[in-house]
Amino acid sequence: AIEARVKAIADDPRVRKALETAEEQVPFAIEEQIALSEIPAPTFHEEERAAELIKRLRAYGLTEITKDAMGNVLARRPGSGTGPAIALAAHMDTVFPAGTDCTVRREGERYIGPGIGDNASGLRNLLQILRSLQAANIETEGDLWFIGSVQEEGEGDICGAKALVKNGI
């Protein structure tokens, strides 16, 4: 039964369109990842990266975007209301201290820079998923929440994510 459901989803032309869009947009997504990575975001100082994330979420069609008291970014993509909500989250901060040169450089097929993998890659994935869903006009049964959390690294002690859980998201 589950296999048949997965096959039906995979065979849906909208899902194929979303996957094709994601593949086609890899070069753009990499540039987006670099741009996000080059915004300094040491733990407790994620504001500038959060502002850029909000700007991009709006550009990709989301209108219900808020920041909670901790500074977490929460963006809702409404579903039809017939299914459970799903949260997709990535933390915005990096382990690198204030003053670190965040320039990303390319060496062959590799991109090297503070926070390019941890966690500009997670933010890139959130945005790439959103763009792909929008391009394919996929309506989900439940709401999708795109979340940029704060204070994950080091002394941040995942406080942003803890606040999300405590507050019911």
Which residues fall in each region the model found?
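Acidic/His- and Gly-rich active-site-bordering loop/insert found
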Residues: 4-110
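Acidic/histidine-rich catalytic neighborhood of metal-dependent amide-processing enzymes
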Residues: 110, 115-169
